[in-house]
């Protein structure tokens, strides 16, 4: 009953399409014209409505935007580098050119949010200049998230600014980095789309002409495919230009390739069944109904499978994948509808003129032989196909992916040229650093937190695979000069060293003092001897003076007696007026007057005697003081000698100690040893250090960032493996410190690809499970057999693994080009979507032919579908393979991997593996359906295999 109802619906649809073939064709032509007029070309829309490909909920993107917010610098994840390269060392001209560039870039606030001007600051200039001095760079944070149209516009604006400033002779400027790399990917992806489309059309035209040997048939089929492609492009452009969906380079390339391949496949299904019916003797109209009844449900199921599988990508989180969901699903539904309406209408019109009539008798002998071999020896055939599949499966364990986009865009791309220039002077990872931020709840601008920040930098730096860490405590990647405790201790002895010679001079003065004291002692002892002699002389003189005094007193007494007797005579000399004139008188007067001085003389002698007595006493006392004076001086001399000896040894020890401390400090400083970092409080007042604080600490001082450079390629599996150890090292560094509650963020190339890697695993799992479930449900609805549906799904899964393994073998081991990380998920998703088509067509035909018996039905099914499916599979495969002409190597890898999968599915799985499995399972292949009931059902989905029936009866049986 179900088959009869389906046949009735298909017959009604076939009659309607046949009757309204011209209006249907005109409707599709009008629709194509309208959607292509109201919306720009797909490539233009993709450029202006390109979505950011980074996962918005990824920790790395959250971290990048948090860093920009806390430092009040940017709110996007797009970074670019402007690289200066000179033939000689960069000098003043290069700096002036650089300053002009930075000034112009800073004026473009629309596209440039922040400039990390390291080279413009002498404090950090060495950190952004190459070791040979011939290259330097400035990092820019641009508007828009990476991969989005706004970010690409920002990159273009930066490139225009750089191009507008003429460089000095011998100096070149390059715009490179992750942002420009993503922009170049869009440019070259769009540029290659016309090439891919042209090659696809050429391949399809050649294969169609070879298959059908009819130029008119091939041209009509190509026109149908072209009309469907234009319709899909216009519809998707209309949706995108009205912001109903986002696009990306990969979306456009995959969409165009799938549209061309699917529309070609479906029209091959239709034309193949039409020609088969004509070959059995049916007239053109009957062949049309046979074609529609035998393929419409297959096209419908295939279209729903492919579109549904692509729409399952909407459950994924990565924009790389979820941007494929709506465009590809809508595009493939459009192809399916066109293949069920436009293509039959064109065939109906063209068949009236015999344009699709077979030009030669088609032979099924080859496919009958293959079918016979399969049903006769299903076990060996299955074993042989498994061995072929094993070739690819064995290559899977050696699979190595690569995340570096540089290797998958043309080397002539501007960003790639910049990367190559950077590689000539810098380590490979310099253009793609990681940024670690520690966010605390207090101001970090103090010596205590500086110790912890340096501990974080040191711990991260000592993580395997890390080449350099720049932070406030090591702005050039090494600890700040003279910041080790041994050096600072050595510097504390600098004053001692400076005073050491003075100390030596004073010790020499002490020695001189000792000598002078000895000399003074000698002089004093000599003085003592002289004083003793003087004392003796004074004592004798005192005795003589007393004797002289006594004699003078006696003389005075005698003269007094004389004066008493001669007083009258004396008076006479005074009375005589003319005494002066009388010599004897005057002489007597003078003599008598002189005797008056004897009294005075005796008084003076008495006084002199008193003085000599005092002098004699004092002299003896002075002599008595010289002995203790000499003893004291001797003691002072002995003390001076002791001090000289002691200080001489002390100075020697101090010299040795300061020399060792200085050597130790210089050694630690020269070795850049970071085991004993310390910044004294006065360092925070240093103007240079304050500039460093502005670079590495947020304006409020609560956040500190670290610029981390990998030792190898950050966009690799090895680079990704560094992320967890970096986070663990930072977490361990703050454990037990005042910053143990701080939040730690990490952003950059490796952390982004780590998030993409983890997101890819999740997304692929979701997409694969959802697609397999969807395929199984659709296959179950068509075949109504759990086992048959499971076989189709199982062979698709096996085909995926083997095809991808063969791609690994070809690209990685033969061409020595590791597969891009995007190849695996993209290829799996697309091959899941299209891999069941040919098995579905075979099983559907087997279901029609099962009335002749299981084995005979299989032979007939293979004979009836072999040629058509092979042509369709080859066309689909080579259409996807034409993506290898893309300038983006990743697109070529995706296309060739899908091509290998389709070739394997067409030539091995559909031709041998699935028939062998169906034969081995026998009746169980159709479980839970019963084969006897299936055989008794009227075969309404295909023509009767007899020429005895009239064409009209055969048409009614379809």
From Swiss-Prot:
Alphabetized InterPro entries for the sequence: MMPL_dom, MmpL_fam, Mycobact_MmpL
Compartments where located: Cell membrane
Homology family: Belongs to the resistance-nodulation-cell division (RND) (TC 2.A.6) family. MmpL subfamily.
Gene: mmpL1
Domain of life the protein comes from: Bacteria
The UniProt record lists the keyword Membrane: yes
Keywords for the protein's UniProt record, in alphabetical order: Cell membrane, Membrane, Transmembrane, Transmembrane helix, Transport
GO cellular component: extracellular region; peptidoglycan-based cell wall; plasma membrane
Transmembrane segments: 19-39, 192-212, 216-236, 252-272, 295-315, 329-349, 377-397, 762-782, 791-811, 814-834, 868-888, 906-927
A Pfam family the protein falls into: MMPL
Signal peptide: none
Name of protein: Probable transport protein MmpL1
Membrane topology: Multi-pass membrane protein
């Amino acid at each position: 009953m179900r088959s009869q109802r389906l046949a009735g619906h298909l017959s009604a649809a076939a009659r309607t399409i046949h009757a309204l073939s011209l209006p249907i064709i005109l409707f599709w032509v009008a629709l194509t014209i309208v959607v292509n007029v109201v919306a720009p070309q797909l490539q233009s829309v993709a450029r202006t409505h390109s979505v950011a490909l980074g996962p918005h909920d990824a920790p790395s993107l959250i971290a990048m935007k948090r860093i920009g917010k806390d430092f009040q610098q940017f709110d996007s994840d797009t970074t670019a580098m402007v690289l200066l390269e000179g033939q000689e060392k960069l000098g003043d001209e290069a700096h002036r050119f650089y300053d002009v560039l930075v000034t112009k870039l800073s004026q473009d606030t629309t596209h440039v949010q922040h400039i990390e001007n390291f080279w413009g600051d002498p404090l950090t200039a060495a950190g952004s200049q190459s070791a040979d001095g011939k290259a330097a760079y400035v990092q820019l944070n641009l508007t828009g998230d990476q991969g989005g149209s706004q970010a690409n516009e920002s990159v273009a604006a930066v490139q225009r600014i750089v191009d507008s400033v003429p460089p000095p002779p011998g100096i070149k400027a390059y715009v490179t980095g992750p942002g420009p790399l993503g922009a170049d990917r869009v440019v070259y992806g769009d540029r290659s789309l016309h090439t891919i489309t042209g090659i696809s059309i050429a391949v399809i035209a050649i294969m169609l002409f070879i298959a059908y040997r009819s130029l008119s048939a091939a041209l009509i089929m190509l026109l149908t495919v072209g009309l469907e492609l234009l319709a899909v492009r216009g519809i998707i452009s209309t949706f995108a230009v009205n912001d109903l969906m986002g696009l990306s380079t990969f979306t456009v390339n995959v969409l165009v390739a799938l549209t061309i391949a699917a529309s070609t496949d479906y029209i091959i299904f239709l034309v193949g069944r039409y020609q088969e019916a004509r070959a059995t003797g049916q007239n053109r109209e009957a062949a049309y109904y046979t074609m529609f009844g035998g393929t419409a449900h297959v096209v419908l199921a295939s279209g729903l499978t492919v579109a549904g599988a692509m729409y399952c990508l909407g459950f994924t989180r990565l924009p790389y994948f979820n941007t494929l969901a709506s465009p590809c699903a809508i595009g493939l539904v459009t192809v399916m509808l066109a293949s069920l309406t436009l293509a039959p209408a064109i065939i109906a019109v063209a068949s009236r003129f015999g344009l699709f009539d077979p030009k030669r008798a088609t032979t099924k002998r080859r496919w009958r032989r293959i079918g016979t071999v399969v049903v006769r020896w299903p076990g060996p055939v299955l074993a042989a196909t498994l061995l072929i599949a094993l070739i690819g499966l064995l290559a899977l364990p050696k699979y190595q992916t690569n995340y570096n986009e540089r290797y998958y865009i043309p080397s002539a791309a501007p960003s790639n040229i910049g990367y190559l220039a950077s590689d000539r002077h810098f380590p490979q990872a310099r253009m793609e650093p990681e940024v670690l931020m520690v966010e605390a709840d207090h101001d970090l601008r103090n010596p205590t937190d500086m110790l912890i920040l340096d501990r974080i930098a040191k711990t991260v730096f000592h993580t395997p695979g890390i080449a350099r860490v720049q932070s406030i405590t090591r702005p050039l990647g090494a600890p700040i000069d003279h910041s080790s405790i041994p050096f600072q201790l050595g510097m504390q002895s600098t004053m001692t060293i400076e005073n050491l010679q003075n100390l030596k001079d004073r010790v020499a003065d002490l020695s001189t003092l000792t000598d002078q004291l000895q000399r003074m002692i000698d002089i004093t002892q000599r003085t003592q001897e002289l004083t003793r002699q003087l004392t003796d002389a004074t004592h004798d003189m005192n005795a003589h003076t007393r004797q002289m005094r006594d004699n003078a007193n006696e003389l005075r007494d005698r003269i007094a007696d004389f004066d008493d007797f001669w007083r009258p005579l004396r008076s006479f000399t005074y009375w005589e007026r003319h005494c002066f004139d009388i010599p004897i008188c005057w002489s007597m007067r003078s003599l008598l007057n002189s005797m008056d001085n004897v009294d005075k003389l005796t008084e003076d002698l008495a006084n002199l005697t008193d003085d000599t007595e005092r002098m004699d006493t004092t002299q003896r006392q002075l002599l008595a003081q010289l002995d203790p004076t000499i003893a004291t001086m001797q003691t002072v001399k002995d003390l001076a000698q002791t001090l000289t000896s002691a200080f001489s040894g002390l100075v020697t020890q101090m010299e040795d100690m300061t020399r060792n401390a200085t050597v130790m400090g210089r050694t630690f400083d020269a070795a850049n040893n970071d085991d004993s970092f310390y910044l004294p409080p006065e360092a925070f007042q240093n103007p240079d250090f304050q500039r460093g604080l502005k670079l590495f600490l947020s304006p409020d001082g609560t956040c500190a960032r670290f610029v981390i450079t990998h030792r190898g390629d950050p966009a690799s599996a090895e680079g990704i493996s560094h992320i967890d150890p970096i986070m663990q090292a930072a977490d361990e560094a703050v454990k037990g410190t005042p910053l143990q509650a701080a939040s730690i963020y990490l952003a950059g190339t490796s952390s982004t690809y780590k998030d993409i890697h983890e997101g890819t695993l999740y997304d692929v799992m979701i997409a694969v499970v959802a697609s397999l479930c969807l395929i199984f449900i659709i296959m179950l609805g068509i075949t109504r057999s759990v086992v048959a549906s499971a076989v189709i799904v199982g062979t698709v899964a096996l085909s995926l693994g083997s095809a991808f393994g063969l791609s690994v073998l070809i690209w990685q081991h033969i061409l020595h080009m590791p597969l891009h990380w995007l190849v695996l998920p993209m290829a799996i998703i697309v091959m899941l979507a299209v891999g069941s088509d040919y098995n579905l067509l075979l099983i559907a035909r087997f279901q029609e032919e099962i009335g002749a018996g299981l084995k005979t039905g299989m032979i007939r099914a293979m004979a009836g579908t072999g040629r058509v499916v092979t042509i369709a599979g080859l066309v689909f495969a080579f259409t996807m393979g034409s993506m290898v002409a893309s300038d983006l190597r990743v697109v070529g890898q995706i296309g060739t991997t899908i091509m290998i999968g389709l070739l394997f599915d067409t030539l091995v799985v559909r031709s041998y593996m699935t028939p062998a499995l169906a034969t081995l399972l026998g009746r169980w292949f159709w479980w839970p359906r019963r084969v006897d009931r299936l055989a008794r059902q009227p075969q309404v989905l295909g023509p009767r295999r007899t020429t005895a029936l009239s064409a009209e009866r055969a048409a009614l049986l379809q």
